[in-house]
Design a protein with these regions (language model features):
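Oxidoreductase and adenylate-handling cofactor-binding alpha/beta cores
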Residues: 170-190, 203, 207-213, 257-262
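N-terminal helix-loop segment corresponding to the beta1-alpha1 unit
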Residues: 1-186, 221, 364, 370-392
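Short Gly/Pro-enriched turn/cap motifs at secondary-structure boundaries
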Residues: 58, 222-227, 233-234, 245, ...
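Flexible, small-/acidic-enriched active-site or ligand-binding loops
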Residues: 338-385
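A glycine-rich dinucleotide-binding beta-alpha-beta segment and adjacent secondary-structure elements
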Residues: 307-357
């Protein structure tokens, strides 16, 4: 039995933040009914065609869900939604600001009709305040949260390589929903959860915020290196490759000098006697490290780092991650079905094995419409009528 077996989630969702949240609920056993626009669906279906003609974002965030096509603005939609929500435990939505209320799905209306329902609203900026009506996409929230200001090189800010603001919001939505389900078990009452992408990202920005507390200068942009710990970042090796390494304390600094650089005299050099001084003397220390590594291959550098118990990593590309020996050794890849055939998917972190989670198919658009409506009491003639009316 999975943790959320028996829980039903209705999702009015698109893009990444809400779908990422609800996919994880599905991973844990919840039944997730994804409502999509007839003929078009979640617009993330059209982001690209990299996975055998399917969008990479959509394949990632939508396995194990049921797809119901429904025109939310159609006159027939309120009754269908009412029947769905009568049997639901959770409603997750990330529609445009104000759209849910215009559809009659304000929290006040939902609470009156379904007092046990947990309602999770995900938005860019929250339901009030001067930014409440602004559109919000991942990169825009990276900008507003200050993330771009501390990411990249000294010359140019750089965005994260994945949808970090969407992921942050999705994770906080997930944890709040799980907490609300526990709370409902005690009180018998649902509740409203409001997750703002901006607030999720600003929480993740707490270290640079505190670093710049009381008007102090913020952490400098340092590329792939750490802004305030050194050496902690990428270094080239003599065979044209790159090794990432990180030191966290003075014991590691001494081991790095003795066993990796093989220059023990550096431990007595006042320029490098503390992390703060090493950070201030970054250009001089980097030159010393690069000169030493230029005489070694990446494998030799890694061997020395491992012997000295210095944390290190290779900078893998996506092909190398697919083939990562650690993930293979731990059997973290499983096959999931899609409309274009099976593809590999990573077991959810924390899952002991495939039996502990749901890893079902990525749905085709509207694949489950008839079955879901039949479960709500609609007969074949009713469903045909709804199709003729273009409600589904």
């Amino acid at each position: 039995m999975r943790p959320l077996d028996g829980i039903t989630v209705v999702a009015l969702e698109h893009a990444i933040a809400a779908p990422f949240c609800t996919r994880q609920l599905a991973d844990l056993g919840a039944r997730v009914i994804k409502i999509e626009r007839p003929g078009v669906g979640d617009f993330a279906r059209a982001y690209d065609s990299r996975v055998r003609g399917q969008a990479s974002h959509f394949v990632w965030t939508n396995r194990s869900k049921e797809s119901l096509t429904l025109d939310l603005k159609h006159a027939e939609a309120p009754l269908i939604l009412a029947r769905l929500l009568a049997g639901a435990d959770v409603l997750v939505q990330n529609l445009m600001p104000g759209a849910a209320a215009r559809l009659g799905l304000s929290y006040e209306a939902l609470r009156a009709a379904h007092p046990r329902l947990i309602v999770c609203d995900i938005s860019g900026y929250g339901a009030d305040g001067p930014y409440r009506d602004k559109k919000a996409y991942d990169l825009l929230i990276q900008s507003e949260s200050g993330f771009l200001s501390v990411t990249g090189s000294a010359e140019e800010p750089v965005k994260a390589g994945c949808s970090i603001a969407d992921i942050a919001a999705g994770m906080y939505a997930l944890s709040n929903i799980l907490a609300a389900l526990i709370e409902r078990g005690r009180t018998g009452q649902g509740k409203r959860i409001e997750v703002s992408m901006l607030e999720a990202m600003v929480e993740w920005m707490s270290y640079p915020l505190y670093y710049a507390f009381d008007g102090a200068p913020p952490p400098p942009r340092a590329g792939a290196a750490h802004a305030t710990i050194y050496p902690y970042g990428p270094f080239p090796t003599g065979d044209g490759r790159t090794v990432m390494l990180g030191l966290q304390n003075e014991r590691e600094w001494r081991a790095f000098c003795d066993q990796v650089l093989r220059r023990p005299e550096l431990t007595a050099d006042e320029r490098f006697s503390t992390n703060s001084r090493r950070t201030e003397a970054r250009p001089q220390l980097r030159e010393i490290i690069v000169q030493a590594f230029d005489l070694l291959t990446a494998d030799q550098v890694v061997a020395r780092l491992d012997e000295a118990q210095i944390a290190n990593a290779r900078i893998n590309d996506m092909r190398e991650v697919w083939e990562h020996p650690q993930l293979k050794a731990r059997r973290r890849w499983v096959q999931v079905d899609t409309p274009a055939g099976p593809v590999p998917a990573l077991l959810p972190p924390g899952a002991a094995d495939v039996d502990a989670v749901r890893m079902d198919a990525v749905p085709a658009l509207g694949q489950h419409t008839e079955a879901i409506l039949a479960g709500l009491g609609y007969g074949a003639a009713d469903i045909d009528r709804l199709r003729r009316l273009q409600a589904i």
